[in-house]
Amino acid sequence: MIVKIEGPIETFAKWKAMVHGNSEKIKKYGMTFLYAGTEKTNETKITTVIRFDTMEGLEDFKADDELHKERAAAGVDLANSVSTPMGDDLLEQYKG
């Protein structure tokens, strides 16, 4: 299951530090960040594309209130973040 999450953040550095500080939870939930970065012209808007190994991992991530508090403390605007499940038919790291 791949999910795209987009939304406002304070700074990428704070967001990235929060992610690194939660590496055990990322492993626990079976998360792999395929992409995480801000828009070139707007450093306060982040896009992440995350692969979850299982639907249970995604559900556990969504239910982790402690993690969401840490995300908010790191400057993630949770109220204005949008999560979009992506289709299973995809190209990944295709180089032609």
Predicted features along the sequence, with ranges:
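Serine/threonine-rich low-complexity intrinsically disordered regions
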Residues: 8-11, 54, 65, 77, ...
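Short, well-ordered beta-strand segments in beta-rich or mixed alpha/beta enzyme
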Residues: 2-8, 35-64
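Generic "edge-of-domain/loop-turn" microfeature
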Residues: 12-14, 55-57, 91
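Glycine-rich beta-strand-turn "strand-cap" elements at beta-sheet edges
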Residues: 29-47, 70-96
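Low-complexity, intrinsically disordered regions enriched in charged/polar residues
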Residues: 20, 61, 84-85
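Short amphipathic alpha-helical segments
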Residues: 11-34, 66-71
